[in-house]
Amino acid sequence: MAQYVYSMHRVGKVVPPKNRILKDISLSFFPGAKIGVLGLNGSGKSTLLRIMAGVDTEIEGEARPMPGIKIGYLPQEPEVDPAKTVREIVEEAVSEIKDAQARLDEVYAAYAEPDADFDALAAEQAKLEAILQAGDGHNLDRQLEVAADALRLPPWDARIEHLSGGEKRRVALCRLLLSAPDMLLLDEPTNHL
C-alpha cells in the first residue's frame, strides 16, 4: 500500500443499534489525485471522510494514510472559536512559524546579555531560522494577506461570533489551506459560500 497516499481495505461502519452506514469499502488514492465523493443524503459521505481524516476510528477493516502524510480535514460545520478574531483563527495554521519568530527575537535579545552562552544561542538561532526558512516565515504576513484576499475573508479584526456561516467556513478553509496538508478532505465545501 506504500505507493498510495491513502488506502482503505474492506472498511465498514455500523452505528448502534445495527445501522450499517458503510459496508466493505476498498479505495486507494495516488498522490496528486483529485477525488469527489458523491451520493444521496445519508449515504455515508461524511462518515467516509471522517474515517479518512482519522476522526472516526471505530470501524471494521483497515484505513490508513501513507506514513508521514499530513491530512487536512474541513468538516461541514468547522470548529472556530467564536471569541477569536479572523486573524487569530487564520494564524493558528502558522503557529509553529510565529512561535519560532517570537523565540528568535528572544534569542537575538539574549545575545546582549552579559552572561550569554553564544554557542547555545547560535545553535538555537540556526534551528529557528531553519523553521522560518522552511515555512517562508520571513514572508508570513504577505502569505496571510494573499490567502485572506483570495478567499475574500472578512476584516482581520472581525470577531468570529459576528460572522455568517459562509464567512466562518471561509476562515476555517483559509486556516486549513495555510497549514499545507498533503491530503485535503473537504466535506460539502461549497455549503454556505
Report residues per predicted region.
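ABC ATP-binding cassette signature C-motif
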Residues: 1-193
